[in-house]
């Protein structure tokens, strides 16, 4: 029987999510990878236990995380029931809908029918009455934004989610969504977007600045650029690496001579800071107050332990920030 560490809140940093009452850990655990059908049940359980013992209270899922679709939620639901039932009120559990989930015209995008049905399925898979945060997972070019945001509002008012968020939105669409949700008095608190030293899209499309101005939180996914911002590829492609095992999101052709030179330069900087490259890349995400939390993925508990160490070293000098910017642009 699992008993959580009595020291779990001693070192983790908790940041306010925009101007809401919600606090999130600086480091959150994402279940996008390594919680699917073929994942080792004991390893999944060990990762969740390790995370919670280190103060990671936020566990992030989506309806189609796996593979197979839904399997991450199903596996997490089993872990919740077996280990975390006494701690449910200490946890922030989030899920999403917006990408392809089931066949036919009602299993994708942002219609009211899809979002409400999908969350009902997610709650059943996880054995929950509600989630803490429910996200629309991507912008829908065809469904009126009023319908999509209205569905999120209905979900909160039905008690199936406490807060709502949006994921993969750009700045202008986020502003429109926020205005609709504010009129509905629906608690929209957070944006989830890809963000890393190598991917500055939310800086370029205005979302990062605008979210801060509007009092909305940001949680960053893919902070390590699917593993590029680590030292694992500096000497070839390891047999157990994501490129070798699962080439869906990162391909070997990403490892160009120029990219490897950038990684090498960043790795040297990290060593000078007393960090691994992965740790520095995570710390960089949290360099200012615009970003509430950074989502990490893990394949084993030891990675979570290493990543959480960033809470002791999240400050950068202006010289360091300038150098990182230059390296990321290829100016070595």
Predicted regions located by residue number:
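Short, acidic/polar
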Residues: 38-51, 110-126, 174-178
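Acidic-and-aromatic substrate-binding clefts and catalytic sites of carbohydrate-active enzymes
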Residues: 36-40, 64-72, 140-144, 171-172, ...
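Alpha-helix N-cap and loop-to-helix initiation/capping positions
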Residues: 39-43, 71, 75, 106-114, ...
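Beta/alpha (TIM)-barrel catalytic core signal, keyed to glycine-rich beta->alpha loops juxtaposed to Asp/Glu
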Residues: 2-9, 143-332
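N-terminal small/glycine-rich loop or linker at the start of catalytic domains
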Residues: 18-36, 94-107, 130, 135
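N-terminal binding-site loop/beta-alpha segment at the start of enzyme catalytic domains
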Residues: 1-91, 157
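Hydrophobic faces of well-ordered beta-strands that scaffold small-molecule active sites
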Residues: 25-29, 59-61, 91-95, 134-136, ...
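Active-site groove signature of glycoside hydrolases
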Residues: 123-143
């Amino acid at each position: 029987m699992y008993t959580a560490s009595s020291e779990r809140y001693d070192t983790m940093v908790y940041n306010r999510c925009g101007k809401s009452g919600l606090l999130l850990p600086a480091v959150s655990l994402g279940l996008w990878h390594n919680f699917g059908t073929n994942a080792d049940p004991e390893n999944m359980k060990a990762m969740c236990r390790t995370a919670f013992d280190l103060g990671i209270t936020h566990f992030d899922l989506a309806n189609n995380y796996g593979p197979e679709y839904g399997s991450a939620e199903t596996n997490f639901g089993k872990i919740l029931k077996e280990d975390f039932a006494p701690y449910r009120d200490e946890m922030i559990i989030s899920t999403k809908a917006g990408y392809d989930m089931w066949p036919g015209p009602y299993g994708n995008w942002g219609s009211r029918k899809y979002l409400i049905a999908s969350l009902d399925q997610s709650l059943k898979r996880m054995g929950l009455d509600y989630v803490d945060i429910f996200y629309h997972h991507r912008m829908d070019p065809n469904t009126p934004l009023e319908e999509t945001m209205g569905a999120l509002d209905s979900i909160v008012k039905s008690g199936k989610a406490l807060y709502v968020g949006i994921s993969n939105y750009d700045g202008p669409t986020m502003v429109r969504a926020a205005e609709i949700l504010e009129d509905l008095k629906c608690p929209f608190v957070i944006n989830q977007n890809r963000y890393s030293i190598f991917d500055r899209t939310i800086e370029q499309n205005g979302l990062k600045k605008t979210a801060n101005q509007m009092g909305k939180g940001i949680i960053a996914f893919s902070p390590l650029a699917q593993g590029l911002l680590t030292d694992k590829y500096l000497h070839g492609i390891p047999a157990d690496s994501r490129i070798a095992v699962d080439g869906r999101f990162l391909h070997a052709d990403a490892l160009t001579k120029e990219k490897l030179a950038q990684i090498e330069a960043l790795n040297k900087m990290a060593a000078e800071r007393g960090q691994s490259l992965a740790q520095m890349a995570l710390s960089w995400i949290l360099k200012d107050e615009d970003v509430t939390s950074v989502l990490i993925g893990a394949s084993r508990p030891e990675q979570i332990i290493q990543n959480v160490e960033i809470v002791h070293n999240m400050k950068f000098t202006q010289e360091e920030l300038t150098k990182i910017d230059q390296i990321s642009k290829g100016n070595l």
